[in-house]
């Protein structure tokens, strides 16, 4: 029995390593609790990619500062229940929990109830994605499929495709258009 448990742990560890996904929980980065939550359905058909259009961060400490600033702006200035995105990806290659799984975001008007929102920290009209960020995003999307959050044939959009905005910035836009689930 101990051997089976050891094998299971090894398989789970390898699966995490293959996806390359490290999710820093909201409690770990010191995020505030949401004032309310609306459940998000499973097996969604869409994922929407954003950029925060703010400062770029390349260390965990700098990314945590940005996350707290964004959450404060979304909650205190805009009056939202929480940070708008389900997940955010820093220049350090970490995935940071925003609203997380199964909670509706506030990231794309008329699309919040049918998509997960993933945002890159920074302004990608000027910043460029690192290979670690690309790996993290693709791993997160694979994880979302594995969890049943989005369907395997999900459609990937840049925010500009579902709203009047430059988001997710030219550099992310050029990158995601090469990904297999992106649709024009």
UniProtKB/Swiss-Prot annotation:
Disulphide bridges, residue numbers: 57-63
Swiss-Prot/TrEMBL site (Important for catalytic activity) positions: 85
Keywords associated with the record: Disulfide bond, Hydrolase, Immunity, Innate immunity, Metal-binding, Secreted, Signal, Zinc
Known role: N-acetylmuramyl-L-alanine amidase involved in innate immunity by degrading bacterial peptidoglycans (PGN). Probably plays a scavenger role by digesting biologically active PGN into biologically inactive fragments. Has no direct bacteriolytic activity.
Signal peptide: 1-20
Cellular compartment(s): Secreted
GO BP term (any one): negative regulation of peptidoglycan recognition protein signaling pathway
Organismal lineage: Eukaryota, Metazoa, Ecdysozoa, Arthropoda, Hexapoda
Required cofactor(s): Zn(2+)
Keyword Metal-binding (UniProt): yes
Residues of the N-acetylmuramoyl-L-alanine amidase domain: 45-169
Positions with a binding annotation for Zn(2+): 50, 159, 167
GO molecular function: N-acetylmuramoyl-L-alanine amidase activity; peptidoglycan binding; zinc ion binding
CDD domains: PGRP
Pfam families for the chain: Amidase_2 (PF01510)
EC number from the UniProt entry: 3.5.1.28
Family under the similarity heading: Belongs to the N-acetylmuramoyl-L-alanine amidase 2 family.
Reaction(s) the record says it catalyses: Hydrolyzes the link between N-acetylmuramoyl residues and L-amino acid residues in certain cell-wall glycopeptides
Entry-linked SMART domains: Ami_2, PGRP
Stored InterPro entries: Amidase/PGRP_sf, Amidase_domain, Peptidoglycan_recognition, PGRP, PGRP_domain_met/bac
Protein name per UniProt: Peptidoglycan-recognition protein SC2
GO cellular component, one term: extracellular region
